[in-house]
Amino acid sequence: WIMGHMVNAIEQVDEFLNLGANAIEFDIDFDKDGIAQITHHGIPCDCGRKCTKKAIFTEYLDNIRQVTTPDDPKFREQLVLLALDLKLQRISSAKAYRAGEDVAKKLLDHYWQRGNSKARAYILLNIPLVEDYEFIRAFKDTLKNEGYESYNDKVGINFTGNEDLDKIRDVLEVLGIHKQVWQADGITSCFTRGTERLKEALKKRDTPGYNYINKVYAWTLVRKSIMRRSLRLGVDGVMSNNPDRVIKVLKEKEFADKFRLATYNDNPWEKFRG
C-alpha cells in the first residue's frame, strides 16, 4: 500500500493518485465539542509541503465516495484504502467518544449512505494516542446502534503516536479488538528515525497467534534510501509525500519480484503469507 500523505484538499486526490498512490491519508480536524469539521493538518507539517490546504469534511467524503464507487464517472480503481488521521490530540480526551459518534454518522451519511452507496474503499481509523481509545468504542457503538454493524468489516484500527506496542495491545484487549489492526511507525519527513520500534512491530506481526498487528507501515518517507530500508525490513505499506518515488523504488531489481501494488482484491486485514 502506498499512502499519499496529507491529501486534504479535494483537488489533491487525483494529484496523488496520478503519482501512483493506491491509498490516501487525510486529516480530520474537530471543534472543541468533538464535531468533525474539516480536512486540515495545519502548521507545522512536513518539510516542503503546504500545511493549510483544507476541505469541509462532509464534502470531502461526498467526493471520495464517487472516486471509490465503480461505474461513477470519477471512479479510480486503484484507490482501495482511506486513512483518516484523527486530530484528537487537539481536543479534550473527554470529547473522544463524541468525536467517534460524529465521524461514524458522517461516514454513514456521506460515504456509505446507509446502504445506498456502492463505495468500496476500506477505512483505517488513525488514532494518535491510546488515551483516545473511547473514539473507537463510540465509533463501533454508533454503527451498532444505527443498524449498520456490518460496516465494521470495512474498518481497521491504527495507533500512530509511536507508543509502547504492549501498551497498545492492552488497550486493544480492553476494547475486544483482535483483528483488523495496523501499526504505524514513523516521524515527520523533516527528520530521520531509527528502526528499533519498526522492527519490533514487524516481529510481532510475524509471530504466530499474535492478533494485534496485521499490517505495518512506515511514515512519512521521502528519501529513496529510507524507502529501500523499510522495504528490506518487510513493511506492508509506505506513507509518502512522493508516491512516484515509491513506485520507482518498487521497480528496482531488488524489489520488483518481492513487492507489488495492493489492489481491491487484497484484504488489508489479513497478514501476508509470502
UniProtKB/Swiss-Prot annotation:
Keywords: Cytolysis, Dermonecrotic toxin, Disulfide bond, Hemolysis, Lipid degradation, Lipid metabolism, Lyase, Magnesium, Metal-binding, Secreted, Toxin. Expressed by the venom gland. The active site is at H5, H41. Its main location: secreted. It is found in: Secreted. The keyword Secreted applies. Binds 1 Mg(2+) ion per subunit. InterPro entries: PLC-like_Pdiesterase_TIM-brl (IPR017946). Its EC number is 4.6.1.-. GO terms for cellular component: extracellular region. It comes from the Eukaryota. GO terms for molecular function: lyase activity; metal ion binding; phosphoric diester hydrolase activity; toxin activity. One of its GO terms (biological process) is lipid catabolic process. Disulfide bonds join C45-C51, C47-C190. Its cofactor is Mg(2+). Mg(2+) binds at E25, D27, D85. It catalyses: an N-(acyl)-sphingosylphosphocholine = an N-(acyl)-sphingosyl-1,3-cyclic phosphate + choline; an N-(acyl)-sphingosylphosphoethanolamine = an N-(acyl)-sphingosyl-1,3-cyclic phosphate + ethanolamine; a 1-acyl-sn-glycero-3-phosphocholine = a 1-acyl-sn-glycero-2,3-cyclic phosphate + choline; a 1-acyl-sn-glycero-3-phosphoethanolamine = a 1-acyl-sn-glycero-2,3-cyclic phosphate + ethanolamine. Belongs to the arthropod phospholipase D family. Class II subfamily. Dermonecrotic toxins cleave the phosphodiester linkage between the phosphate and headgroup of certain phospholipids (sphingolipid and lysolipid substrates), forming an alcohol (often choline) and a cyclic phosphate. This toxin acts on sphingomyelin (SM). It may also act on ceramide phosphoethanolamine (CPE), lysophosphatidylcholine (LPC) and lysophosphatidylethanolamine (LPE), but not on lysophosphatidylserine (LPS), and lysophosphatidylglycerol (LPG). It acts by transphosphatidylation, releasing exclusively cyclic phosphate products as second products. This is Dermonecrotic toxin SdSicTox-betaIIB1ai. It comes from Sicarius cf. damarensis (strain GJB-2008) (Six-eyed sand spider).
